[in-house]
UniProtKB/Swiss-Prot annotation:
One of its GO terms (molecular function) is transcription cis-regulatory region binding. SUPFAM superfamilies: CheY-like. Disruption phenotype: Expression of CbpA down-regulated at transcript and protein levels. Significantly increases nasopharyngeal colonization in mouse CD-1 strain intranasal infection model at 48 h and 96 h post-infection. Significantly increases numbers of bacteria found in the mouse lung at 96 h post-infection. Keywords: Activator, DNA-binding, Phosphoprotein, Transcription, Transcription regulation, Two-component regulatory system. Member of the two-component regulatory system HK06/RR06 involved in regulation of target genes, including choline-binding protein CbpA. Binds to the promoter region of CbpA and directly activates transcription. The modification 4-aspartylphosphate is found at D51. Pfam families: Response_reg, Trans_reg_C. This is Response regulator RR06. Phosphorylated at threonine residues by StkP; threonine phosphorylation enhances RR06 binding to DNA and may also increase expression of CbpA. May be de-phosphorylated by PhpP. It comes from Streptococcus pneumoniae serotype 2 (strain D39 / NCTC 7466). InterPro entries: CheY-like_superfamily (IPR011006), OmpR/PhoB-type_DNA-bd (IPR001867), Sig_transdc_resp-reg_receiver (IPR001789), WalR-like (IPR039420), WH-like_DNA-bd_sf (IPR036388).
């Protein structure tokens, strides 16, 4: 689980990162708005903690750009706790607003709550005539069991966890690497996707030219 922490104040940035690292999350840090956008090109980001007032690009500007390409939970940090600021934040589809100063313990609890809301997948996933059991790694299409490899189902699970978010082949492989050893070149993702589409008729898996794949749900 990759969490991006963006704040131009080093003490705040590193304090949040330390707490999250202790909880087992992988933390990426950014000190300004432009760096935030660059980080999104390097790694799949699952959740972002974003300060509003940053150099180069403000949190408002970052939110506008991120919303065009990614669907991830965002917690906004701000020294401004007035109704107008909070209204603007939620208008840009942020999930939560935390006013500085704040409790790190409570912030981490808010983060965990958002992760549960966004990313906890039921053991059984259903889409039209498809049923997938991610516990037993079995899939059925029109009540008939379909022969699929665990790697193919891991790719499907990865896309579901990032629903409506475009992932590159490299990002998909990185996501499933903790479960699969000795991964081949990234083009094997094309084979996995082709198999999922063919055997399960998953028209919800969309190819984004020159970028990668996403699942539209």
């Amino acid at each position: 689980m990759n969490i991006l922490v963006a704040d131009d104040e080093e003490m705040i940035r590193e304090g949040i990162a330390a707490f999250l690292t202790e909880e087992g999350y992988h933390v990426i840090m950014a000190k300004d708005g432009q760096e935030v956008l660059e980080k999104f090109q390097d790694l799949p980001i699952h959740l972002m903690v974003l300060d509003l007032m940053m150099p180069r690009k403000s949190g408002f500007e970052v939110l506008k750009e991120i919303n065009q390409k990614h669907d991830i939970p965002v917690i906004v940090l701000s020294a401004l706790g007035d109704e107008t600021t909070q209204s603007q934040v939620f208008d840009l589809y942020a999930d939560d607003h935390v006013t500085k100063p704040f409790s790190l313990v409570l912030l981490v609890k808010r983060i965990k709550a958002l992760i549960r809301r966004y990313y906890v997948i039921e053991d059984i996933w259903r889409y039209q005539d498809v049923t997938v059991d991610f516990t037993s790694y079995k899939a059925h299409y029109k009540n008939e069991e379909i022969d699929l490899k665990p790697k193919e189902l891991l790719v499907l699970k990865c896309l579901i966890q990032h629903k409506n978010q475009v992932l590159s082949r490299e990002q998909i492989l990185e996501e499933i690497s903790k479960d699969v050893a000795d991964l081949p070149c990234d083009r094997v993702v094309d084979v996995y996707i082709r198999t999922l589409r063919k055997k399960l008729a998953l028209d919800c898996i969309v190819t984004v030219k020159n970028v990668g794949y996403k699942i539209s749900l």
